[in-house]
């Protein structure tokens, strides 16, 4: 089954290769949706020739996931620049790069400064001449958007708890810092992300919430019809569902998330 697909990709690659090359538009493989969104924000949507299986760009060939990139497809696409997240092993990413291809691994999830740095690194690798000015404007914009939220220092936790295993965003994560900048007292008492595994103690999440006593739980959802985890429900806590797609892609999309947060807290 894979051979016909590879043949089609080979034909597509030949067609694309026949187009005039542009120094301002390198052929890019983006191995994570948040990287694709960053490239689009930089005006490089047409430079992307391959994306991961999780990307919303249905018009482009799929190049596997961050853990298991598809080396065969990437080779056929013959990119000039391959960008992935830190979840892809560095040696694996470098080994599957065609000769002469630049590889890059970025983060963006380890705080707001890290989010901005990831954008700078992507832009510099892609040859965006004004990337520093762009990121400086974005930094000012998200801070202004956060200031408008007026969180009132409410005790809060930020979780994805509406599908699968819940997890909380703690100190040192981009979401923790964004919500703190929005005037909320984020009371997660852990660093990084804390997972509440389905095979763990059944009362682990309720006990944790009882211990930190949040006034509001921001539950990031992937779709409008998801039902949030029943363990979140408590008499003295407000649950505010938010569109996870606006928050979990570090970069300019968080401006939409901060606007939704402002509207949710100031109806």
Predicted regions span which residues?
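Bacterial Sec-exported substrate-binding components of ABC uptake systems
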Residues: 2-40, 59-60, 71, 76, ...
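Extracytoplasmic substrate-binding proteins
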Residues: 23-27, 81, 91-167, 188-190, ...
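A short, structured surface patch at a secondary-structure boundary
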Residues: 26-87, 91, 184-187, 197-201, ...
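Short secondary-structure boundary segments
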Residues: 32, 86-87, 108, 160-162, ...
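Short, solvent-exposed loop/turn elements at domain surfaces
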Residues: 36-41, 57-59, 164-170, 226-228, ...
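Short, structured coil segments at secondary-structure junctions
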Residues: 44, 98-101, 182, 233-237
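Short helix-loop-beta junction
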Residues: 175-188
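Exported/periplasmic ABC-transporter solute-binding proteins
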Residues: 198, 221-232
């Amino acid at each position: 089954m894979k051979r016909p697909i590879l043949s089609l990709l080979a034909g597509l690659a030949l067609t694309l290769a026949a187009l005039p090359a542009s120094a301002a538009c390198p052929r890019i493989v983006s191995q994570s949706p948040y990287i694709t969104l960053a490239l689009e924000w930089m005006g490089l949507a047409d430079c992307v020739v391959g994306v991961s299986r999780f990307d919303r760009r249905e018009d482009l060939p799929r190049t596997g996931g961050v853990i298991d990139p598809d080396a065969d497809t990437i080779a056929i696409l013959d990119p000039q620049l391959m960008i992935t997240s830190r979840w892809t092993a560095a040696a694996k990413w470098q080994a599957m790069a065609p000769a002469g291809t630049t590889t890059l691994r970025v983060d963006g999830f380890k705080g707001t400064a890290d989010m901005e740095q990831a954008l700078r690194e992507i832009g510099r690798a892609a040859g965006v001449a004004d990337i520093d000015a762009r990121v400086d404007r974005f930094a000012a914009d998200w801070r202004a958007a956060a200031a408008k939220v007026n969180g009132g220092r409410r005790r809060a936790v930020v979780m994805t708890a509406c599908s699968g295993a819940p997890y909380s965003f703690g100190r040192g994560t981009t979401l923790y810092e964004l919500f703190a900048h929005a005037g909320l007292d984020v009371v997660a008492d852990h660093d990084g992300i804390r997972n509440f595994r389905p095979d763990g103690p059944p009362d682990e999440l309720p006990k944790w919430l009882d211990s930190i006593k949040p006034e509001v739980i921001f539950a990031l959802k992937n779709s409008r019809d998801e039902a949030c985890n029943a363990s979140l429900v408590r008499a003295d806590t407000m649950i505010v569902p938010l569109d996870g797609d606006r928050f979990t892609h570090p970069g300019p999309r968080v401006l939409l998330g901060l606007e939704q947060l402002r509207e949710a807290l100031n109806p």
